[in-house]
Amino acid sequence: MASLFAIGFSKFSPQPTSDYSKLLKVFHPKPYSLKFLFLKTLNPTRFFKVRANDGTEPSDKLQQYFQNQDYDKKYGFLENIDSFTIPKGLSEETIRLISKLKKEPAWILEYRLKAYAKFLKLEEPKWSDNRYPLLDLQDMCFYSAPKKKPTLNSSDIADEADDPKLLEEFDRLDVPLTKKKKCSPKVAVDAVYNSESIAITNKEPLEKSGVIFCSISEAIRKYPDLIKKYLGRVVPSDDNYYAALNTAVFSDGSFCYIPKNTRCPMPLSSYFRMNSIENTGQFERTLIVAEEGSFVEYSEGCTAISHDKNQLHAAVVELYCAEGAEIKYSTRGLCAGDRSKISWTQVEKGFAITWKYPSVVLEGDDSVGEAENARNTSTCDSMLIGDNAAANTYPYIQVKNPSARIEHEASTSKIGEDQIFYFQQRGIDHERALAAMISGFCRDVFNKLPNEFGAEVNQLLSIKLEGSVG
Protein backbone atom coordinates (compact mmCIF):
# COMPACT_ATOMS: atom_id res chain seq x y z
CA MET A 1 0.00 0.00 0.00
CA ALA A 2 1.16 3.44 -0.65
CA SER A 3 0.26 6.34 1.57
CA LEU A 4 0.65 9.72 -0.04
CA PHE A 5 -0.23 13.09 1.35
CA ALA A 6 0.69 16.68 0.82
CA ILE A 7 1.79 18.96 3.61
CA GLY A 8 0.20 22.20 2.55
CA PHE A 9 -0.78 22.84 -1.07
CA SER A 10 1.30 20.60 -3.27
CA LYS A 11 1.84 20.37 -6.98
CA PHE A 12 -0.14 17.16 -7.05
CA SER A 13 -2.82 18.05 -4.54
CA PRO A 14 -6.46 17.94 -5.67
CA GLN A 15 -8.49 21.10 -5.71
CA PRO A 16 -11.93 21.06 -4.10
CA THR A 17 -13.19 23.24 -6.92
CA SER A 18 -13.17 23.21 -10.69
CA ASP A 19 -12.71 26.97 -10.80
CA TYR A 20 -9.10 27.59 -11.91
CA SER A 21 -9.28 31.22 -10.82
CA LYS A 22 -9.02 30.08 -7.21
CA LEU A 23 -5.65 28.53 -7.89
CA LEU A 24 -4.14 31.98 -8.23
CA LYS A 25 -5.07 33.15 -4.75
CA VAL A 26 -2.29 33.88 -2.30
CA PHE A 27 -2.67 31.75 0.78
CA HIS A 28 -0.72 30.20 3.63
CA PRO A 29 -1.88 26.63 4.13
CA LYS A 30 -1.38 24.73 7.34
CA PRO A 31 -0.81 21.02 7.53
CA TYR A 32 -4.06 20.27 9.29
CA SER A 33 -7.74 21.07 8.93
CA LEU A 34 -10.49 18.97 10.36
CA LYS A 35 -11.77 16.30 8.01
CA PHE A 36 -12.43 12.71 9.05
CA LEU A 37 -12.80 9.33 7.54
CA PHE A 38 -12.90 6.53 10.07
CA LEU A 39 -12.81 2.99 8.78
CA LYS A 40 -12.62 -0.11 10.88
CA THR A 41 -12.26 -3.64 9.66
CA LEU A 42 -11.10 -6.93 11.09
CA ASN A 43 -9.43 -7.77 7.82
CA PRO A 44 -6.32 -6.23 6.26
CA THR A 45 -6.94 -2.91 4.60
CA ARG A 46 -5.35 -0.60 2.14
CA PHE A 47 -5.62 3.14 2.01
CA PHE A 48 -4.32 5.82 -0.26
CA LYS A 49 -4.64 9.36 1.00
CA VAL A 50 -4.22 12.77 -0.50
CA ARG A 51 -4.79 15.91 1.51
CA ALA A 52 -4.80 19.45 0.26
CA ASN A 53 -5.81 22.96 1.15
CA ASP A 54 -7.00 25.37 -1.52
CA GLY A 55 -6.46 28.46 0.63
CA THR A 56 -10.06 29.67 0.43
CA GLU A 57 -10.78 32.43 2.91
CA PRO A 58 -13.31 31.53 5.64
CA SER A 59 -16.75 32.99 5.10
CA ASP A 60 -18.62 32.23 8.32
CA LYS A 61 -18.12 31.87 12.05
CA LEU A 62 -17.78 28.12 11.90
CA GLN A 63 -14.82 28.43 9.57
CA GLN A 64 -13.28 31.19 11.67
CA TYR A 65 -13.14 28.69 14.52
CA PHE A 66 -10.09 27.19 12.87
CA GLN A 67 -8.10 30.41 12.52
CA ASN A 68 -5.17 30.95 14.82
CA GLN A 69 -1.51 30.02 15.10
CA ASP A 70 -1.68 27.13 17.59
CA TYR A 71 -0.36 24.64 15.04
CA ASP A 72 2.71 26.81 14.40
CA LYS A 73 3.53 26.80 18.10
CA LYS A 74 3.03 23.08 18.60
CA TYR A 75 4.10 21.48 15.32
CA GLY A 76 4.69 24.03 12.56
CA PHE A 77 7.89 25.60 13.88
CA LEU A 78 11.16 25.50 11.92
CA GLU A 79 14.49 24.54 13.49
CA ASN A 80 17.71 25.20 11.59
CA ILE A 81 19.29 21.74 11.84
CA ASP A 82 22.64 21.17 10.15
CA SER A 83 21.73 18.63 7.46
CA PHE A 84 23.11 16.96 4.36
CA THR A 85 20.82 17.17 1.33
CA ILE A 86 21.39 15.66 -2.10
CA PRO A 87 20.65 17.65 -5.28
CA LYS A 88 17.11 17.75 -6.63
CA GLY A 89 15.94 15.41 -9.35
CA LEU A 90 15.11 11.74 -9.88
CA SER A 91 17.30 9.43 -11.95
CA GLU A 92 19.20 6.16 -11.69
CA GLU A 93 22.13 8.16 -10.30
CA THR A 94 19.87 9.48 -7.52
CA ILE A 95 18.94 5.95 -6.51
CA ARG A 96 22.55 4.77 -6.56
CA LEU A 97 23.55 7.75 -4.41
CA ILE A 98 20.86 7.04 -1.81
CA SER A 99 21.91 3.40 -1.62
CA LYS A 100 25.57 4.40 -1.27
CA LEU A 101 24.84 6.92 1.48
CA LYS A 102 22.98 4.25 3.41
CA LYS A 103 25.78 1.70 2.86
CA GLU A 104 23.37 -0.89 1.52
CA PRO A 105 24.30 -4.32 0.13
CA ALA A 106 24.21 -4.85 -3.63
CA TRP A 107 20.96 -6.84 -3.58
CA ILE A 108 19.00 -3.88 -2.20
CA LEU A 109 20.41 -1.58 -4.88
CA GLU A 110 19.31 -4.10 -7.50
CA TYR A 111 15.87 -4.24 -5.85
CA ARG A 112 15.62 -0.45 -6.05
CA LEU A 113 16.71 -0.26 -9.69
CA LYS A 114 14.18 -2.89 -10.76
CA ALA A 115 11.44 -0.87 -9.06
CA TYR A 116 12.65 2.29 -10.79
CA ALA A 117 12.47 0.54 -14.18
CA LYS A 118 8.85 -0.38 -13.41
CA PHE A 119 8.14 3.17 -12.22
CA LEU A 120 9.27 4.63 -15.55
CA LYS A 121 6.59 2.59 -17.32
CA LEU A 122 3.79 3.86 -15.07
CA GLU A 123 1.86 7.13 -15.16
CA GLU A 124 0.72 9.29 -12.29
CA PRO A 125 -2.88 8.28 -11.53
CA LYS A 126 -5.68 10.66 -12.47
CA TRP A 127 -7.97 10.65 -9.48
CA SER A 128 -11.59 11.71 -9.37
CA ASP A 129 -12.83 14.75 -11.25
CA ASN A 130 -10.79 17.25 -9.23
CA ARG A 131 -8.22 19.28 -11.11
CA TYR A 132 -4.65 19.54 -9.90
CA PRO A 133 -1.22 20.09 -11.48
CA LEU A 134 1.06 17.15 -12.13
CA LEU A 135 3.79 16.35 -9.64
CA ASP A 136 7.24 17.53 -10.76
CA LEU A 137 9.64 14.95 -9.36
CA GLN A 138 12.63 16.65 -10.96
CA ASP A 139 12.05 19.66 -8.69
CA MET A 140 12.17 17.55 -5.55
CA CYS A 141 14.93 16.40 -3.22
CA PHE A 142 14.79 12.70 -2.33
CA TYR A 143 17.18 12.55 0.62
CA SER A 144 17.99 14.87 3.50
CA ALA A 145 19.40 13.85 6.88
CA PRO A 146 20.94 15.58 9.92
CA LYS A 147 24.72 15.48 9.91
CA LYS A 148 24.83 14.47 13.57
CA LYS A 149 22.47 11.88 15.07
CA PRO A 150 21.79 11.50 18.81
CA THR A 151 23.79 8.93 20.76
CA LEU A 152 21.67 6.82 23.11
CA ASN A 153 23.07 5.37 26.34
CA SER A 154 22.18 2.03 27.92
CA SER A 155 18.93 3.54 29.17
CA ASP A 156 17.96 4.60 25.64
CA ILE A 157 18.32 8.28 26.54
CA ALA A 158 20.13 10.67 24.24
CA ASP A 159 23.31 12.39 25.30
CA GLU A 160 22.48 16.06 25.71
CA ALA A 161 25.88 16.89 24.23
CA ASP A 162 24.45 15.92 20.85
CA ASP A 163 22.91 18.50 18.54
CA PRO A 164 20.77 20.42 21.06
CA LYS A 165 18.44 21.84 18.41
CA LEU A 166 17.57 18.40 17.09
CA LEU A 167 16.85 17.04 20.56
CA GLU A 168 14.89 20.16 21.50
CA GLU A 169 12.74 19.79 18.40
CA PHE A 170 11.59 16.31 19.39
CA ASP A 171 11.09 17.45 22.98
CA ARG A 172 8.75 20.16 21.72
CA LEU A 173 6.88 17.53 19.72
CA ASP A 174 6.42 15.45 22.91
CA VAL A 175 8.76 12.77 21.59
CA PRO A 176 11.37 13.12 24.35
CA LEU A 177 14.82 11.67 23.79
CA THR A 178 16.71 13.30 26.68
CA LYS A 179 16.81 13.17 30.48
CA LYS A 180 15.18 16.59 30.52
CA LYS A 181 11.96 14.95 29.35
CA LYS A 182 12.55 11.30 30.10
CA CYS A 183 11.31 8.82 27.52
CA SER A 184 7.99 7.17 28.29
CA PRO A 185 8.55 3.63 29.60
CA LYS A 186 5.22 2.58 28.11
CA VAL A 187 5.95 3.11 24.40
CA ALA A 188 8.94 2.32 22.18
CA VAL A 189 9.42 5.10 19.63
CA ASP A 190 11.36 5.26 16.37
CA ALA A 191 12.07 8.95 15.73
CA VAL A 192 12.60 9.72 12.03
CA TYR A 193 13.87 13.12 10.93
CA ASN A 194 13.41 13.84 7.21
CA SER A 195 15.10 10.82 5.58
CA GLU A 196 16.82 9.17 8.57
CA SER A 197 15.83 7.33 11.71
CA ILE A 198 17.75 9.14 14.45
CA ALA A 199 16.84 7.21 17.60
CA ILE A 200 14.78 4.30 18.94
CA THR A 201 13.77 4.26 22.60
CA ASN A 202 13.08 1.36 24.99
CA LYS A 203 14.88 -1.26 22.91
CA GLU A 204 16.12 -3.21 25.94
CA PRO A 205 12.74 -4.56 27.17
CA LEU A 206 11.85 -5.47 23.59
CA GLU A 207 15.07 -7.41 23.09
CA LYS A 208 14.43 -9.37 26.29
CA SER A 209 11.13 -10.51 24.75
CA GLY A 210 12.79 -11.42 21.47
CA VAL A 211 11.09 -8.56 19.63
CA ILE A 212 13.11 -6.81 16.92
CA PHE A 213 12.34 -3.10 16.57
CA CYS A 214 14.79 -1.05 14.53
CA SER A 215 15.02 1.15 11.47
CA ILE A 216 14.50 -0.53 8.10
CA SER A 217 18.06 0.51 7.18
CA GLU A 218 19.49 -1.33 10.18
CA ALA A 219 17.31 -4.36 9.45
CA ILE A 220 18.63 -4.57 5.88
CA ARG A 221 22.17 -4.86 7.27
CA LYS A 222 21.49 -7.07 10.33
CA TYR A 223 18.55 -9.23 9.25
CA PRO A 224 18.85 -9.65 5.47
CA ASP A 225 17.09 -13.03 5.44
CA LEU A 226 13.94 -11.57 7.03
CA ILE A 227 13.97 -8.56 4.71
CA LYS A 228 14.40 -10.72 1.61
CA LYS A 229 11.53 -12.95 2.74
CA TYR A 230 8.96 -10.25 3.55
CA LEU A 231 9.85 -6.96 1.81
CA GLY A 232 7.42 -6.41 -1.06
CA ARG A 233 5.36 -9.47 -0.18
CA VAL A 234 2.26 -7.45 0.70
CA VAL A 235 2.84 -4.43 -1.53
CA PRO A 236 4.92 -5.35 -4.58
CA SER A 237 6.85 -2.61 -6.32
CA ASP A 238 4.51 -2.67 -9.33
CA ASP A 239 1.37 -2.38 -7.18
CA ASN A 240 0.87 1.26 -8.20
CA TYR A 241 2.70 4.40 -9.30
CA TYR A 242 3.66 5.59 -5.81
CA ALA A 243 4.51 2.11 -4.54
CA ALA A 244 7.06 1.85 -7.35
CA LEU A 245 8.41 5.32 -6.54
CA ASN A 246 8.74 4.50 -2.86
CA THR A 247 10.48 1.17 -3.53
CA ALA A 248 13.04 2.95 -5.69
CA VAL A 249 13.90 5.80 -3.32
CA PHE A 250 12.74 4.80 0.19
CA SER A 251 15.00 6.25 2.83
CA ASP A 252 13.99 5.02 6.26
CA GLY A 253 11.14 3.67 8.33
CA SER A 254 10.60 1.01 10.96
CA PHE A 255 11.07 -2.75 11.00
CA CYS A 256 9.31 -4.84 13.60
CA TYR A 257 9.47 -8.63 14.01
CA ILE A 258 7.38 -10.43 16.64
CA PRO A 259 8.45 -14.06 17.18
CA LYS A 260 6.01 -16.96 17.43
CA ASN A 261 3.65 -16.92 20.46
CA THR A 262 5.07 -13.60 21.69
CA ARG A 263 3.10 -10.62 22.93
CA CYS A 264 5.00 -7.37 22.40
CA PRO A 265 5.53 -5.96 25.93
CA MET A 266 4.63 -2.40 24.94
CA PRO A 267 3.04 -0.45 22.07
CA LEU A 268 5.38 0.56 19.25
CA SER A 269 5.30 3.90 17.50
CA SER A 270 7.13 5.74 14.72
CA TYR A 271 7.20 9.52 14.56
CA PHE A 272 8.07 11.13 11.23
CA ARG A 273 9.17 14.75 11.29
CA MET A 274 9.54 16.77 8.08
CA ASN A 275 11.60 19.90 8.65
CA SER A 276 13.00 21.39 5.48
CA ILE A 277 12.49 24.68 3.67
CA GLU A 278 13.41 22.92 0.44
CA ASN A 279 11.00 20.83 -1.61
CA THR A 280 12.04 17.62 0.14
CA GLY A 281 10.08 14.37 0.08
CA GLN A 282 9.88 11.80 2.84
CA PHE A 283 9.70 8.20 1.63
CA GLU A 284 8.94 5.98 4.57
CA ARG A 285 9.19 2.20 4.30
CA THR A 286 7.86 0.23 7.24
CA LEU A 287 7.62 -3.55 7.57
CA ILE A 288 5.88 -5.34 10.45
CA VAL A 289 5.91 -9.13 10.72
CA ALA A 290 3.86 -10.98 13.35
CA GLU A 291 4.56 -14.71 13.52
CA GLU A 292 2.02 -17.33 14.63
CA GLY A 293 0.12 -16.52 17.81
CA SER A 294 1.85 -13.17 18.36
CA PHE A 295 0.43 -9.73 19.11
CA VAL A 296 1.69 -6.20 18.47
CA GLU A 297 0.19 -2.74 18.62
CA TYR A 298 1.77 -0.11 16.38
CA SER A 299 0.95 3.53 15.67
CA GLU A 300 2.65 6.29 13.75
CA GLY A 301 2.37 10.03 13.29
CA CYS A 302 3.79 12.66 10.99
CA THR A 303 4.03 16.43 11.31
CA ALA A 304 5.79 19.09 9.28
CA ILE A 305 6.63 22.75 9.43
CA SER A 306 3.99 25.17 8.21
CA HIS A 307 4.94 25.48 4.58
CA ASP A 308 3.88 27.78 1.75
CA LYS A 309 5.40 25.31 -0.70
CA ASN A 310 4.65 21.63 -1.09
CA GLN A 311 6.12 18.69 0.77
CA LEU A 312 5.58 15.08 -0.20
CA HIS A 313 5.26 12.11 2.12
CA ALA A 314 4.92 8.93 0.04
CA ALA A 315 4.93 5.90 2.31
CA VAL A 316 4.60 2.16 1.95
CA VAL A 317 3.76 0.16 5.05
CA GLU A 318 3.52 -3.63 4.94
CA LEU A 319 1.98 -5.83 7.61
CA TYR A 320 2.38 -9.60 7.56
CA CYS A 321 0.15 -11.48 10.00
CA ALA A 322 0.66 -15.24 10.41
CA GLU A 323 -1.81 -17.80 11.75
CA GLY A 324 -3.47 -16.74 15.00
CA ALA A 325 -1.48 -13.50 15.16
CA GLU A 326 -2.93 -10.02 15.67
CA ILE A 327 -1.67 -6.62 14.57
CA LYS A 328 -3.33 -3.36 15.53
CA TYR A 329 -2.38 -0.76 12.97
CA SER A 330 -3.65 1.52 10.23
CA THR A 331 -2.72 0.41 6.73
CA ARG A 332 -2.79 -2.50 4.31
CA GLY A 333 -1.80 -5.91 5.57
CA LEU A 334 -2.02 -9.57 4.67
CA CYS A 335 -3.76 -12.05 6.95
CA ALA A 336 -1.95 -15.07 5.58
CA GLY A 337 -2.83 -17.57 8.30
CA ASP A 338 -6.06 -19.00 9.68
CA ARG A 339 -7.76 -16.86 12.35
CA SER A 340 -5.27 -14.05 11.88
CA LYS A 341 -6.54 -10.55 12.58
CA ILE A 342 -5.63 -6.97 11.77
CA SER A 343 -7.56 -4.17 13.48
CA TRP A 344 -7.49 -0.96 11.48
CA THR A 345 -8.06 2.43 13.12
CA GLN A 346 -7.27 5.65 11.27
CA VAL A 347 -7.58 9.27 12.35
CA GLU A 348 -7.14 11.89 9.62
CA LYS A 349 -7.07 15.58 10.41
CA GLY A 350 -6.10 17.56 7.38
CA PHE A 351 -6.84 19.77 4.46
CA ALA A 352 -9.85 20.50 2.33
CA ILE A 353 -9.96 17.07 0.71
CA THR A 354 -9.15 13.68 2.20
CA TRP A 355 -9.32 10.71 -0.18
CA LYS A 356 -9.05 7.11 0.90
CA TYR A 357 -9.09 3.95 -1.14
CA PRO A 358 -9.44 1.13 1.40
CA SER A 359 -9.31 -2.39 0.01
CA VAL A 360 -9.06 -5.79 1.59
CA VAL A 361 -6.70 -8.64 0.76
CA LEU A 362 -8.54 -11.84 1.74
CA GLU A 363 -6.52 -14.99 2.35
CA GLY A 364 -6.80 -17.71 5.06
CA ASP A 365 -9.75 -19.56 6.66
CA ASP A 366 -12.08 -17.36 8.72
CA SER A 367 -9.88 -14.34 8.15
CA VAL A 368 -9.14 -13.96 4.46
CA GLY A 369 -10.86 -14.00 1.17
CA GLU A 370 -10.20 -16.98 -0.98
CA ALA A 371 -11.16 -19.21 1.94
CA GLU A 372 -14.53 -19.90 3.56
CA ASN A 373 -16.60 -17.67 5.84
CA ALA A 374 -14.47 -14.54 5.49
CA ARG A 375 -16.07 -11.35 6.81
CA ASN A 376 -15.24 -7.68 6.32
CA THR A 377 -17.05 -4.68 7.79
CA SER A 378 -16.21 -1.05 7.07
CA THR A 379 -17.86 1.97 8.66
CA CYS A 380 -17.49 5.54 7.42
CA ASP A 381 -18.87 8.30 9.67
CA SER A 382 -18.45 11.92 8.59
CA MET A 383 -19.15 15.20 10.38
CA LEU A 384 -19.58 18.36 8.32
CA ILE A 385 -18.67 21.78 9.70
CA GLY A 386 -19.86 24.79 7.71
CA ASP A 387 -22.01 25.28 4.64
CA ASN A 388 -19.25 24.44 2.13
CA ALA A 389 -18.20 21.07 3.55
CA ALA A 390 -19.02 17.81 1.79
CA ALA A 391 -18.30 14.11 2.26
CA ASN A 392 -18.63 11.61 -0.58
CA THR A 393 -18.35 7.87 -0.10
CA TYR A 394 -17.99 5.58 -3.11
CA PRO A 395 -17.79 1.99 -1.86
CA TYR A 396 -16.72 -0.64 -4.38
CA ILE A 397 -17.23 -4.21 -3.25
CA GLN A 398 -16.32 -7.28 -5.28
CA VAL A 399 -16.97 -10.73 -3.81
CA LYS A 400 -15.96 -13.92 -5.61
CA ASN A 401 -16.70 -16.35 -2.81
CA PRO A 402 -20.42 -16.84 -1.96
CA SER A 403 -19.62 -17.66 1.67
CA ALA A 404 -17.89 -14.32 2.24
CA ARG A 405 -19.77 -11.55 4.05
CA ILE A 406 -18.91 -7.97 3.16
CA GLU A 407 -20.60 -5.00 4.83
CA HIS A 408 -20.30 -1.25 4.34
CA GLU A 409 -21.98 1.48 6.34
CA ALA A 410 -21.76 5.26 5.97
CA SER A 411 -23.36 8.14 7.85
CA THR A 412 -23.10 11.92 7.67
CA SER A 413 -23.95 14.50 10.31
CA LYS A 414 -23.60 18.27 10.39
CA ILE A 415 -23.04 20.86 13.08
CA GLY A 416 -25.71 23.50 12.68
CA GLU A 417 -26.17 27.01 14.03
CA ASP A 418 -29.06 25.80 16.19
CA GLN A 419 -26.74 23.42 18.03
CA ILE A 420 -24.20 26.20 18.57
CA PHE A 421 -27.00 28.47 19.81
CA TYR A 422 -28.08 25.79 22.29
CA PHE A 423 -24.58 25.71 23.81
CA GLN A 424 -24.26 29.49 23.87
CA GLN A 425 -27.55 29.83 25.75
CA ARG A 426 -25.93 27.84 28.52
CA GLY A 427 -22.87 30.06 28.72
CA ILE A 428 -20.57 27.91 26.55
CA ASP A 429 -18.72 29.94 23.94
CA HIS A 430 -18.58 29.10 20.24
CA GLU A 431 -15.17 27.44 20.21
CA ARG A 432 -15.80 25.23 23.24
CA ALA A 433 -19.16 24.20 21.82
CA LEU A 434 -17.53 23.03 18.60
CA ALA A 435 -14.77 21.25 20.49
CA ALA A 436 -17.30 19.42 22.67
CA MET A 437 -19.36 18.20 19.71
CA ILE A 438 -16.31 17.12 17.71
CA SER A 439 -14.81 15.29 20.68
CA GLY A 440 -18.08 13.48 21.30
CA PHE A 441 -18.35 12.53 17.64
CA CYS A 442 -14.86 11.01 17.70
CA ARG A 443 -15.15 9.26 21.06
CA ASP A 444 -15.67 5.80 19.58
CA VAL A 445 -12.42 6.19 17.65
CA PHE A 446 -10.46 7.48 20.63
CA ASN A 447 -11.60 4.54 22.76
CA LYS A 448 -9.90 2.15 20.34
CA LEU A 449 -6.54 3.90 20.63
CA PRO A 450 -3.96 3.36 23.38
CA ASN A 451 -4.31 5.92 26.16
CA GLU A 452 -1.19 7.83 25.13
CA PHE A 453 -2.25 8.20 21.50
CA GLY A 454 -5.91 8.85 22.26
CA ALA A 455 -4.94 11.80 24.43
CA GLU A 456 -2.59 13.12 21.74
CA VAL A 457 -5.25 12.93 19.03
CA ASN A 458 -7.80 14.62 21.27
CA GLN A 459 -5.31 17.43 21.89
CA LEU A 460 -4.65 17.74 18.17
CA LEU A 461 -8.37 18.11 17.51
CA SER A 462 -8.52 21.02 19.94
CA ILE A 463 -6.07 23.03 17.84
CA LYS A 464 -7.84 25.78 15.95
CA LEU A 465 -6.52 25.95 12.43
CA GLU A 466 -6.04 28.53 9.74
CA GLY A 467 -7.19 28.04 6.18
CA SER A 468 -9.90 25.44 6.71
CA VAL A 469 -12.58 25.47 4.06
CA GLY A 470 -14.86 23.02 5.89
Swiss-Prot record:
One Pfam family per UniProt:
SUFBD_core
Q: Name the gene for this chain.
A: ABCI9
Which Gene Ontology BP terms does the record give? iron-sulfur cluster assembly
Which InterPro entries does the record match to this protein? Answer: Fe-S_cluster_assembly_SufBD, SUF_FeS_clus_asmbl_SufBD_core, SUF_FeS_clus_asmbl_SufBD_sf, SufBD_N
Q: Please, which domain of life does this record's source organism belong to?
A: Eukaryota
Cross-referenced PANTHER family:
FES CLUSTER ASSEMBLY PROTEIN SUF (PTHR30508), UPF0051 PROTEIN ABCI8, CHLOROPLASTIC-RELATED (PTHR30508:SF1)
Which organism does this sequence originate in?
Answer: Arabidopsis thaliana
- Could you tell me what this protein is called? Iron-sulfur cluster assembly SufBD family protein ABCI9
Give the family per the record. Answer: Belongs to the iron-sulfur cluster assembly SufBD family.
